[in-house]
Each structure stands twice: as structure tokens, then as C-alpha cells.
Amino acid sequence: MINIPITKILFLDIETVGGCPDFESCQKFSPEIADQFNKYFDWFLKRFPEDNGLTKDEVFTKRAALVPEFAKIVCVSVAFVLDNGETKKQSFSGEDEKKLLKEVRTLLDRCENLGFYLCGHNLKNFDIPMLAKRMIINGIR
């Protein structure tokens, strides 16, 4: 078993929303995203069989936040424990996703240089892939 001091762990969680409020507005303002969603629609119905019978708009509203191409990250919260046991927390949030992601990237780079490990619920299967893909989409390296 790996023994990592709690003072070397960065706890991380993200919150996402759909990039458009609904499919209709997505078709108007982001036709390329709407086209992508049309290609994904059958995948959504296979992945979430409970959504069979829902309209395309209902599926988009319910599931868009789960796929980086259709999502937007609105909040990233982190926490870590100091040597004296005190817990420090910080949240990055706002309408400007690119600015938020740049701030998070700066923090993650700093933590990597200090030898921190990341910890979070479903971090490997959701948070990290979502962060990475949204950073690529927003041109953040």
C-alpha cells in the first residue's frame, strides 16, 4: 500500500453545466456543437437507456454537462491540509470558463512542482478527462 502524507494531497472536484441552455438555442448559436450532439444522440440513448422516449432537447438538457464537447466547467474546488493540520480551501468559479481554467492550470502546475497527488471522487474517469478536454477546447496548454 502507498503511504502518502495528507499534506501532499490536493483534493479536487469540478462542477459542469451544459454549454447551451437547451438544444434549440444550441442549434441557433452553436450549430457545430448541435451537429456533434446529433452524432452523439444514439450513444446517449444506449449509455442511458432510461432516457429512451425523451426528446432530443430533453436528453441534451439532462446529459450535455457530462460530455466535454457539450459542457462548460463552472466551478473547480480544491482543498489541502497544512503541516499544522489546518485545512485550506479554494474555489474557482465564474462565467468566463477560459479564465477559470487558466487559474486552475496555474494551481495544478504549482502543485505538481511541489509533489502533490490529486484525490477526488471519480477523478480519473470524469474530473481529469473533463478538465483536460475543456482546456484543449479553450486553447490552454
Give the ranges of each region predicted by the language model.
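Short glycine-rich loop/turn motifs
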Residues: 72-76
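Entry/capping segment at the start of metal-dependent catalytic domains
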Residues: 1-71
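Conserved DEDDh/DEDDy metal-dependent 3′-5′ exonuclease domain
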Residues: 2, 78-141
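Short, conserved beta-strand segments within well-ordered enzyme catalytic domains
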Residues: 10-11, 77-79
